[in-house]
Amino acid sequence: MTQNSNPPNKLVQKLQRHRKARWLFWAGTSGLILLLGWLFSSYYPESFYPPLAADPPWNLAFWVSEGMDWLIVNFAVIFDAIKLVTRWVLNSIEDSLLMLHEWSLLAIIVLWAWRLAGRRVAIFSGAAMYFIGMLGLWELCMSTLALIATAVLISMAMGIPIGILAARSDRINNTIRPVLDVMQTMPAFVYLIPAVMFFGLGNVPGVMATVIFAAPPAVRLTNLGIRQVPKDLVEAGHTFGSTDFQLLFKVQLPLALPSIMAGINQTIMLSLSMVVLAAMIAAGGLGREVYMALGQVDIGRGFVAGTTIVLVAMVLDRITQSLGQRGKRGTSAL
């Protein structure tokens, strides 16, 4: 036993020493470069080594602005059509929510929370929505829900098909991956600028900025869910003569449902995180209440509106998480 275990131990120790030596080499090289740079800058005038940004030759901001102006001039009809459709969907959802009596809608929320997520989530959802009503923020809450619902519908309508295409083609996957990385890492404030330029002020640009920020998880998790479907099940479907369409809708999408539901959950949470930023471009709802409290330095008003947003997020998170778990149990039964 001892003779067999010694060689692997020696090999591990040798690899560890080699790894430490590499780290020491790179750390020493970095330190030497810093030292040489400091000595060089101390003994030579600045004119000898002009800074990179002394006279920047790349005016990227100008070209981006020119591109935006070109899009506005040449595609104004398309942007107007998108604005009209989005406004109609948003207003339809908001009017439907506000048309119902508060107690009726509260009962419906509790009923469906019980059906989809169980008794505990139903009790919590009912208590949270009742608390929101007692704070006098019911109508603003419904406006926020309408904005979130519209953004999530658009995000899923775009994200799921793109995720399916990315799962079926490595070339498409490699193409959209850097785009999704940029969409997720770009500061959310930046999305407000093109939203205002293309769609003006109000709820519609708020929805569009939210879609840009919240759509990537829908694409990524749909792609991931389909790619994680076992290969033997796909091959079995081909063996029994299933077409690609049948294989997608009867095998791959049902098995990818837990991952897709996780994408919906993440999209909803990211949409909620945008409601306050969307208020900066005149979007309504609870975000505007927080923004107004910030402008008036009204701590109580901001706390109440912020607490309401948190409660809405918790209710939606619990329900959508339960849907994902139900989908996981359904796929395991398959």
Where in this protein do the model-derived segments appear?
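Hydrophobic/aromatic residues within the transmembrane alpha-helices of Major Facilitator Superfamily
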Residues: 186, 198-199, 211-215, 222-226, ...
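Glycine-rich helix-loop "coupling/hinge" segments at transmembrane-helix boundaries
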Residues: 197, 226, 271-312, 324-334
